[in-house]
């Protein structure tokens, strides 16, 4: 607003007033300047990520938690040697762990790129195509709704009122005979 002019209640012309505390970019007030410097600014695109809890919204709780016991089980009476069972457990667990790491190393970034593009396109289409189409449809359907309402009130309401009056005088007596 620098250079702007305004008129007070008596009609005097003034330039735009300068705030004593400055603005958010250049605060004149020392306390305000220190407060601005102390605040941490977080950007949604460069925020810190949690490297320990990588599923904070629990998206994969019941889908991907597959352990050895969930896949391989020996019923009572048909057991392999204990050493084979332990080696199978270790092989399964280590293979699953390292093969997942290998796949995520090879395909993690390309898949993140593909899914990022997909959700960007989906968001774009929703914002620029779907919502405007729905709003347009709702505006256009109001006209049809009014015509339909007039039709119902003109033709159907009198018909149903007449049928209702016809059947309103019907009386039913029920007697219980012993």
Swiss-Prot record:
It is a peripheral membrane protein. GO terms for molecular function: molecular adaptor activity; oxysterol binding; protein kinase binding; transmembrane transporter binding. It holds the Pfam family Caveolin. It comes from the Eukaryota. Keywords: Acetylation, Cell membrane, Golgi apparatus, Isopeptide bond, Lipoprotein, Membrane, Palmitate, Phosphoprotein, Ubl conjugation. Phosphorylated at Tyr-14 by ABL1 in response to oxidative stress. Its main location: Golgi. This is Caveolin-1. It is found in: Golgi apparatus membrane; Cell membrane; Membrane, Caveola; Membrane raft. The modification Phosphoserine is found at residues 2, 9. Residues 131-142, 167-178 are annotated as: Interacts with SPRY1, SPRY2, SPRY3 and SPRY4. Residues 105-125 dip into the membrane without crossing it. Belongs to the caveolin family. It comes from Dasypus novemcinctus (Nine-banded armadillo). Residues 149-160 are annotated as: Interacts with SPRY1, SPRY2, and SPRY4. Residues 82-94 are annotated as: Interaction with CAVIN3. Residues 2-104, 126-178 are cytoplasmic. There is a cross-link at residues 5, 26, 30, 39, 47, 57 (Glycyl lysine isopeptide (Lys-Gly) (interchain with G-Cter in ubiquitin)).
């Amino acid at each position: 607003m620098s250079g702007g002019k305004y008129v007070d209640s008596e009609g005097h012309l003034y330039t735009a007033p300068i705030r004593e505390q400055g603005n958010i970019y250049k605060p004149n007030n020392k306390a305000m300047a220190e407060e601005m410097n102390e605040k941490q600014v977080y950007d949604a695109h460069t925020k810190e990520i949690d490297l320990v809890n990588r599923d904070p919204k629990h998206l994969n709780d019941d889908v991907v938690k597959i352990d050895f016991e969930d896949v391989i089980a020996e019923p009572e009476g048909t057991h392999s040697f204990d050493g084979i069972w332990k080696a199978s457990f270790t092989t399964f667990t280590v293979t699953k762990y390292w093969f997942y790491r290998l796949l995520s190393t090879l395909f993690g970034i390309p898949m993140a790129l593909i899914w990022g593009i997909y959700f960007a396109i989906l968001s774009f289409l929703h914002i620029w195509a779907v919502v405007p189409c729905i709003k347009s449809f709702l505006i256009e359907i109001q006209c049809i709704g009014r015509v339909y309402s007039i039709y119902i009130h003109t033709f159907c309401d009198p018909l149903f009122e007449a049928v209702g009056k016809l059947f309103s005088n019907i009386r039913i007596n029920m007697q219980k005979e012993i």
